[in-house]
């Protein structure tokens, strides 16, 4: 038996999320990958992913593993999969790893990036990958609000409504808000995230950037442990799973270069 790790990228616009769903609920990343891998390995395949992205959310660097008794060389998997999965999903890399390596146990953290088009006029060329916010955002206030979320907290306030039970205590290591013209990004690194947590962070920071909420109220929102005290969840299309960190060194490199930590 062999254990294979694959790196996957996908445009989530037309997908029903990462996690496999009943057939009548649309294509999923997990379902498509398992179908394709079963074809090229000539046996049923079950994959395990590091992050369960929602419907409409994208990924540049999703990590999955699967075990197989098949003989296909790992380096041939990305090319072999092209014929068996939708064009919205691409296997970037495949490597053989120790049998005991599991994606949820052997990672140090994740980075998500939320993208906003901040201009009165929409951009039809990138609308699949951003949230269009028409009114000007105060980037400095958004960064100040993000700084209030750093550290280890109970993030119940920022979890999705009707989400499955999970430990709400998470650690946010870095938040960086940046604007280049009308292109605004909210980058977040943490040890793990609750359902809808990053999208709720984006929605909260946008409310601050628009003057609807105050930086000094952020700690109070967290202390309330109540989803109802914050606004709407930011739309899915602006969110992308940017990277999953296998090593502490790689995570620290990103934190130093992008987050100045």
Model feature map: region roles:
Residues 1-261:
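Structured-RNA-binding interfaces characteristic of tRNA pseudouridine synthases
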